[in-house]
Curated annotation (Swiss-Prot):
It is an enzyme of class 1 (oxidoreductase). The gene is kmo. Pathway: Cofactor biosynthesis; NAD(+) biosynthesis; quinolinate from L-kynurenine: step 1/3. This is Kynurenine 3-monooxygenase. Its cofactor is FAD. It comes from Flavobacterium johnsoniae (strain ATCC 17061 / DSM 2064 / JCM 8514 / BCRC 14874 / CCUG 350202 / NBRC 14942 / NCIMB 11054 / UW101). GO terms for molecular function: FAD binding; kynurenine 3-monooxygenase activity. Catalyzes the hydroxylation of L-kynurenine (L-Kyn) to form 3-hydroxy-L-kynurenine (L-3OHKyn). Required for synthesis of quinolinic acid. PANTHER family: KYNURENINE 3-MONOOXYGENASE (PTHR46028:SF2). It catalyses: L-kynurenine + NADPH + O2 + H(+) = 3-hydroxy-L-kynurenine + NADP(+) + H2O. Keywords: FAD, Flavoprotein, Monooxygenase, NADP, Oxidoreductase, Pyridine nucleotide biosynthesis.
Length: 446
């Protein structure tokens, strides 16, 4: 147990709530602030890509004994269902029994706040933080930026307030603070596949559904109530874009042509399309993440990524796992804890940002590409035979807790091998033969 401190966590989202549980269990007084109303008392909809919980997320939840409470609201998905225009393909994610888990962001966030309150954390909603004094961890709270502010002093402040973090914004005014953000030229919009009348799912509920169409794509993840949360990813401008779909008929014609099997399961398509906002996708990087032993950024506040590997929440939760490891290692030496935390996490945050961007290219174009599908089949056969020699990149990221940076490096090495293998004569017919197996073994020796 550490010496008890008075700690503020800014942001009551998933990472902020879980961090509050960890800090509370370590013996601290924890106050969680959020500028928004209590999510448990309002309807939550319109801009949520469902979450895909995988190993790193479960490890962090199980680390404070709340994993089973979250498993109750999660649906396992053991495969991709790839909806081509004229056929449906299934592609298993990992080994037998390996799944990612679909969870509604709103449902999970409510659950996490309940769990944090039960652990003893105190929540303060509709509290607007306009500034923080870094040197003495003082929050400045008020109704407006130009009105009167109240000061609340803490021993330490954690910024878990997302990609557009107010705490980070204050740190950016420091000398030698590096910061970059990059928006994709595409956005996303939420749509909904309702449940059948008997509350069953209209599509296979244990699949991550994806309609890959190159520059744009549709995905759907299952919810407990029998519905699916769908997300349409499209460029903002251009021929096939949000800008180009200006009336109901254009939207319906576009879906009829490009996602024909989705039309019958999205009855409110046009209404959803024009009612729900179009949201942006941003990658944000910065460094340092900490200030002395007073301030630390965590989760999206220091490494926002695009959602195409389903790792945003998992990476944020893993920040907490690593922070906790440093707490156990260095006790009350918070300066050392913060330094080691950011040194450990920064290269891995950069790696998952890169992997997420690349996976967008994979999901949107390659899942419909015959050569890519052949590569996946060859990798699967070889990996099943030689699990000690080949763990596919997706499995390294999703079903292990080895560092993201290691997964990126090994994935690049494996990809180089597969490029050579796919050049073999008649590979389409000999892919599942000793010749191909031996070629991979030979290339692994180099």
């Amino acid at each position: 147990m550490q010496t008890s401190l008075k700690i503020a966590v800014v942001g009551s989202g998933l990472v902020g709530s879980l961090l509050a549980i960890y800090l509370k269990k370590a013996g601290h007084t924890v106050h969680v602030y959020d500028r928004s109303p209590d999510i448990r008392k309002i309807n939550f909809s319109g801009r949520s890509i469902n979450l895909a919980m995988s190993n790193r997320g479960w490890k962090a939840l199980d680390g404070v004994g709340v994993g089973d409470a979250v498993r109750e609201i999660a649906i396992p998905m053991d495969k991709r269902a790839i909806h081509l225009v004229d056929k449906l393909n299934f592609q298993n994610y990992g080994q037998e029994g390996e799944s990612i888990y679909s969870i509604s962001r709103g449902t999970l966030n409510r659950k996490m706040i309940d769990l944090a309150e039960n652990a003893g954390a105190e929540f303060y909603f509709e509290q607007k933080i306009w500034d923080v004094t870094l040197s003495d961890a003082t929050l400045h709270i008020g109704e407006s930026e130009r009105g009167e502010w109240e000061e609340r002093k803490y021993d330490m402040v954690f910024g878990a307030d997302g990609a557009f973090s107010r705490i980070r914004h204050r740190m950016q005014r420091q000398s030698m603070f590096n910061y970059s953000q990059e928006f994709l030229n595409m956005g996303y919009k939420e749509l909904n596949i309702p449940a059948n009348a008997d509350r069953t799912h209209k599509l296979d509920k244990n699949s991550f559904h994806i309609w890959p169409r190159g520059e744009y794509m549709l995905i759907a993840l299952p919810n407990l109530d029998g519905s699916f949360t769908c997300t349409l990813f499209m460029p903002f401008e251009g021929e096939n874009s949000f800008e180009s779909l200006t009336d109901r008929k254009m939207v319906e014609d576009f879906f009829e042509k490009n996602f024909p099997d989705s039309i019958e399961v999205i009855p409110e398509l046009a209404n959803d399309f024009f009612k729900n906002p179009t949201s942006t996708l941003v990658t944000m990087k910065c460094f340092p993440w900490t200030y002395e032993d007073k301030i630390a950024l965590i989760g999206d506040a220091c490494h926002a990524i695009v959602p195409f590997y389903g790792q945003g929440m998992n990476a944020g939760f893993e920040d907490i796992t690593v922070l906790n490891e440093m707490i156990e290692k260095f006790g009350d030496d918070w300066k050392k804890i913060f330094t080691e935390y950011q040194i450990s996490r920064k290269p891995n945050a950069d790696a998952i940002a890169e992997l997420s961007y690349r996976n967008f290219m994979e999901m949107s174009t390659k899942t419909a590409d015959e050569k890519f599908l052949l590569q996946k089949k060859i990798e699967k056969v070889f990996s099943d035979k030689h699990p000690d020699k080949w763990i596919p990149l997706y499995s390294r990221v999703t079903f292990s807790d080895r560092p993201y940076a290691e997964a990126l490096a090994i994935g690049d090495f494996q990809n180089g091998i597969m490029e050579e293998v796919l050049k073999l004569d008649n590979i389409e017919n000999i892919w599942n033969t000793p010749e191909v197996e031996n070629k991979i073994l030979e290339l692994l020796q180099k």
